[in-house]
């Protein structure tokens, strides 16, 4: 099972990624984790990546793809792998295709932006413990107060509506075009000797268990 998980920030990809990893016994491939590990290990690609990171520059896609290919050779990828958060752009998707990275499924978890804004902007956190609440879906017993300590809850900057909207704008511009990219490739079929991935789209609305059932149905 080799798949890419697509969906906007706040669509619930992380939760479903954990279910997929557990069911199929595959690792989640995080480019951030790979970069940090390569830099720490001092591999040639890691050393090269560090020069960009130290200057505050984006690591080039060619370097990221090199790290991905190295990572996929490791033993835990024998049964497959899960990409969440990569590729983010058409250029990265093209680079993966040119590098011959095989993908069986591209799964999109679709949630309307209005729902994502409500989900994320309604979160409230107790900073000391990390306990989280939601003003609508999981409210504290006393408004604005932690259930255990009675201390004030805060809204993290990441959860503020304007921040969420900005992240969704970036997704709309950079990552949403991948939905068309992979849908078109699935219709065209194999290219350059690389099998086209099957494209699946499910609704990310409803209970976590309902969404999990949809995910597993889509991956049959």
UniProtKB/Swiss-Prot annotation:
Alphabetized UniProt keyword annotations? ATP-binding, Cytoplasm, Kinase, Nucleotide biosynthesis, Nucleotide-binding, Transferase
- Where in this protein does the record put region LID? 122-159
Output the Gene Ontology cellular-component terms. Answer: cytoplasm
Record-listed E.C. numbers? 2.7.4.3
Its pathway, per UniProt, is: Purine metabolism; AMP biosynthesis via salvage pathway; AMP from ADP: step 1/1
Q: Where do the annotations place AMP binding? A: 31, 36, 57-59, 85-88, 92, 156, 167
The UniProt entry, under CDD domains, shows:
ADK
Gene Ontology molecular functions: adenylate kinase activity; ATP binding
Location of this chain's protein in the cell = Cytoplasm
GO biological process terms, alphabetically, are:
AMP salvage
* Residues that, per the record, bind ATP: 10-15, 123, 132-133, 206
- Quote the InterPro entries the UniProt record gives: Adenyl_kin_sub, Adenylat/UMP-CMP_kin, Adenylat_kinase_CS, Adenylate_kinase_lid-dom, P-loop_NTPase
Q: Specify where it is mainly localized.
A: cytoplasm
**What catalytic activity is recorded?**
AMP + ATP = 2 ADP
Q: Which Pfam families match?
A: ADK, ADK_lid
Q: Where is this region: NMP?
A: 30-59
Q: How does it assemble?
A: Monomer.
Tell me, what does this protein do in biology? Catalyzes the reversible transfer of the terminal phosphate group between ATP and AMP. Plays an important role in cellular energy homeostasis and in adenine nucleotide metabolism.
Similarity annotation: Belongs to the adenylate kinase family.
* UniProt remark on domains: Consists of three domains, a large central CORE domain and two small peripheral domains, NMPbind and LID, which undergo movements during catalysis. The LID domain closes over the site of phosphoryl transfer upon ATP binding. Assembling and dissambling the active center during each catalytic cycle provides an effective means to prevent ATP hydrolysis.
Q: What is this protein called?
A: Adenylate kinase
Q: Which organism is it from?
A: Burkholderia pseudomallei (strain 1710b)
